[in-house]
Amino acid sequence: MARSIEDAATGALAGSAVGDALGGAAEGNTPAVIQERYDGTIEGIVPPFHADWRTARPIAPYHKGDGHVTDDTLMTGLLVDVYAEVRRHLTAHDVADHLVPRMIGEVRWIPELEAEALPLQRVFLAEKWLVTRLHYGHVDPREAGVGNVVNCGATMYVAPIGLVNAGDPAGAYAEAIDVAGAHQSSYGREAAGVFAAAVAAAAAPDATVTDVVDASLALAKDGTRAAIEAVVEAASSLDGWRGDGLAVLRDAVRPFDTVGDAYRQPAMDARL
């Protein structure tokens, strides 16, 4: 039986929050280090990677782990709130007019801070860029993402764009590319578009994994498309990611990854 759009939306948003809460504890660490820390893969709620989380990384004194969601879920919720307010499709201008004001003006519970605070006080530098450029710099929202760290910062919260465009991957891609222009550029912006398209394809009645992959490949450009193709080809020979699966997938994506295997030690070609 086909899923309803309500079920698809609930599953996407709740699932992303649960995944965020499970993975947040180990974010930024390699699979080998994660498995050493937790005596295997993460199968449920785990404590912080660093027991002394307040001081282990002073630049990010967040209580990751123990089931706490991160800024991924916070930003996703803010985007849902924007849709609830405007009741229409979004553009980059809506990021300036509706999303940023929420980041700097709406106090809410921030689990990782163990306090009520502004979302601005939890998001990291690539998301603070939104406030700097749009609220203080008055930059054209359609171009504000240029110069920011090119990363997954926009991708992490565009699932609602895919849901609003359920069954229309091309529409989701176009809307996410526009919205993400206020935050990201280059392959960071492209990733947001392709991810939203994948969610839109997955939200269609009776959607299959093949449908999602095909929709993503039909819209992805340049290195993003090549990377997806490489990973899909590698994954087709696997029964799952456990065992040697992670290494096979990592080998497939490595040629396209300018960051390098160690997340906080960029490769020589990391500069744009």
Language model segments and positions:
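Structured, active/binding-site neighborhoods that engage oxygen-rich ligands
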Residues: 1-272
